[in-house]
Amino acid sequence: MSKLKTKKYNAVANAEKDASQTFVKGAAILTLSMVIVKVFGLLDKVILTGIFSGVSFEQAVAGGTETVNFASFGLGLYSNAYEIFVVIFTVATGGLPIAISRLVSESTAQKRFNDVKQIHRVSIPFFVIVGILSFAILVGASFIYVQIIESPYSLLGMLCLSPTVLFGCLVSIYRGYYEGQRNMFPTAVSEIIEATIKLFIGAFLAYIIAHLGMNSYAESGTVFGLYIANQTEAYQTIVSFSVAGAIMGITLGSAASFVFYILKFKIQGDGIPEEYYRNSVEARSKRETFNKILKTAIPVAMGSLIMSVGSLIDQVIVQRVLLNMIETNPQALQAQYSKYFTADMFYADTKTIHTSLWGCYSAALTFLQLVTAVTQVFGSSAMPNVTSAWTKGNKDELKKSIETVIRLTMLFTFPMALGMMALSFPIMGLVYNDPLITDVGGRILLIMGVTTIFGAASTPVCSMLQGIGRVDLPMKLYTVCMAVKIGITWMFVSVPEINVQGATVGSMITYAIMTIVGMYLLIKYSKIKPDLFGTTVKPLIGAIASAASAFGAYHLMESIIGSARMSIAVSLAVSIFVAVIVYIAVLLILRFPQ
């Protein structure tokens, strides 16, 4: 009994609280952590952009010299490292944590506490095996993928990232378990640990490696012992090593997150007092439990896999189409980007431009992911509540949970998305301070604002479908939507005047279909009709007013204090402050929420 006294958290008592209270509390905890994580992630990209920009040299041109830097190239390599990783990581961890969360929540609602323990026991060996296999597959796949996208400099970063899939599987053993108990605190802490190490250790390693690489090349003409005759290739090699250092911060962060979970579980136990086990029915057999986990996990994992593979194909198409465009019709891109790339890059060094343009897309994508990450939190927090209400057959609680998720999602998403559209160019200019990224990324972010609305809404909608037991529906929906996305992306990116910006159009249409059809299916199968008008229209009106005020305030400030980087920061701060005040005022006038 002495061990029980060390427990500071009672999972059963928490599960018996009002669903809306636990949802709001869980969402608040995860939202706070996610904001910290995404701010750290944004700072990481800002710092890395500065580091990669520092890897530069002066090149003689007609009438003088110009600086050649590798900021967008470095961001492109950084993004490429994630592409194949995301697919394999999703297969390894995409379905099982959600399955464990749902089954733990369901078993707790049914007071089958021995099943809760059995679920945890059965998941451990399975996750370990999956993690080791996924790590080995990722290492092998990295060598193939760099050949497909013709980006050999991406390989080192991919290899440094590969251990993360193993640690991610080990973390998932505990993350799904705690989330199923409506305890979001461990997830929040572990994510902050990962983000902190990624930011500080990763940036430190990237800087040191870039600094040592440039010194090595200046003194001996070699990069860490490698003789490279061409100066551009030498600096690209330095950037690839620097990117690998930054990615090592991610791997170390995931390892530290796993250590945190191990220590927490050993010190505090599983959160279920011993008397609940004694009074519970006997647990299902390990085989039955394992089959139940797989039955729930496979459709979820397949849906996530389809999304990831679709995105991977999408990314390959974008880069291959851009590369083909450079090789067959360089004049079309040169007319648009001649001030950012030397003539040799369009005709001789053709493997740099498509990676750099992809880096611009990746830079803008960071802001969409900031919003969708928060709404994904709403979906994760809603899952146990929706599952519990559905299991109990409590229609009122289910309706309340669904409406709360929609309301919070729209309340957060609308102002963020429209604000990004209104301030796209100054945001990119301030954050990255690179002419190419500001120009191309600003145009992408402008379109991406609409994409953000549907992308942010689709995740919690699919989570709620899984919560009511229809884990198969998101998978089917993802399959159709990814096919649409690939076709639209190919069509738009192939137009030289649109090029990389076309990837955003495909995403926008895909997420719109996913959200609208997903909501229809949720209403159909839950037999619940949420108040969509009341939960969406008022936040939209407030967001339009706030975005308009932000746009006006920024340009007024710009006309007064100019457009230097510090001036942009001041103008953005003032415009965002004005937008927040206007948004709150409009919501109060409209009495939202009632």
PLM features: what roles do these ranges have?
Residues 185, 196-259, 472, 482-516, ...:
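Membrane-interface helix-loop junctions in multi-pass transport and translocation proteins
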Residues 62-66, 74-93, 331-350, 354-375, ...:
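Alpha-helical transmembrane segments of polytopic membrane transporters and translocases
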Residues 37, 93-98, 160-179, 187-195, ...:
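Short runs within selected transmembrane alpha-helices of multi-pass transporters and secretion channels
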Residues 94-109, 364, 375-392:
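Helix-loop junctions and terminal segments of transmembrane helices
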Residues 18-98, 135, 165, 299, ...:
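Signature of the first transmembrane helix
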Residues 2-10, 554-594:
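Membrane-proximal transmembrane or re-entrant/amphipathic helices at the cytosolic face
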